[in-house]
Amino acid sequence: MAAQKDQQKDAEAEGLSATTLLPKLIPSGAGREWLERRRATIRPWGSFVDQRRFSRPRNLGELCQRLVRNVEYYQSNYVFVFLGLILYCVVTSPMLLVALAVFFGACYILYLRTLQSKFVLFGREVSPAHQYALAGGVSFPFFWLAGAGSAVFWVLGATLVVIGSHAAFHQIEAVDGEELQMEPV
């Protein structure tokens, strides 16, 4: 018991533990497990952003090799870069924040209503999937006014540029016990 507490203190001394970083609102299940696996396999941010490790690839073969290897090696880091870009996009767009608030507010109201009694519309019981579709339909005009479509494409484009640039220009690290194979041209 004491050894387990010492290990937990050591992990917290290194940084925030995965359980404190994950929001309590994410329910237990596949999504939470996936996010915990991503958090557990994240590479050190120091080596991820080390400026001395960036250089121009010598040829197209090296570029392709870097892209494949870095995307595989830094996959979890890239997921968090993507999530950071989404957060940046939402925070810097007040109308998108309003649209998200309307959508999640409608979902929350429907959730509270189903706790009290079943939702009946025109004499028929409405399933939870249809209720959330109704919430999406109600909030759709707000998303349209907020320019959510352009925000989605901005996030995708920015992600491709940032991750693609990093993967192309970051030098490949030799993994323990594995050396790079050079083929003659």
Swiss-Prot record:
Pfam families cross-referenced by the UniProt entry: PRA1
Q: Which residues cross the membrane?
A: 79-94, 95-112, 132-148, 149-165
Topological category with respect to the lipid bilayer = Multi-pass membrane protein
Q: Where is this region: Required for interaction with GDI1?
A: 165-185
Q: Where is this region: Homodimerization?
A: 175-185
Which cellular component, as a GO term, is one annotated location? plasma membrane
Q: What is its main location?
A: membrane
List all topological domains (Cytoplasmic). 1-78, 113-131, 166-185
Q: InterPro entries, per this entry?
A: Prenylated_rab_accept_PRA1
Keyword line = Cell membrane, Cytoplasm, Cytoplasmic vesicle, Golgi apparatus, Membrane, Synapse, Transmembrane, Transmembrane helix
Q: Where is this region: Required for interaction with prenylated RAB3A and VAMP2?
A: 30-54, 175-185
Q: What compartments host this protein?
A: Cell membrane; Cytoplasm; Golgi apparatus; Cytoplasmic vesicle, Secretory vesicle, Synaptic vesicle
Q: What does this protein do?
A: General Rab protein regulator required for vesicle formation from the Golgi complex. May control vesicle docking and fusion by mediating the action of Rab GTPases to the SNARE complexes. In addition it inhibits the removal of Rab GTPases from the membrane by GDI1.
On subunit structure and binding partners, the annotation says:
Homodimer. Interacts with VAMP2 (synaptobrevin-2), prenylated Rab proteins, GDI1, NRDG1 and PCLO.
Record's family?
Belongs to the PRA1 family.
PANTHER family noted in UniProt: PRENYLATED RAB ACCEPTOR 1-RELATED (PTHR19317), PRENYLATED RAB ACCEPTOR PROTEIN 1 (PTHR19317:SF0)
Q: What protein is this chain from?
A: Prenylated Rab acceptor protein 1
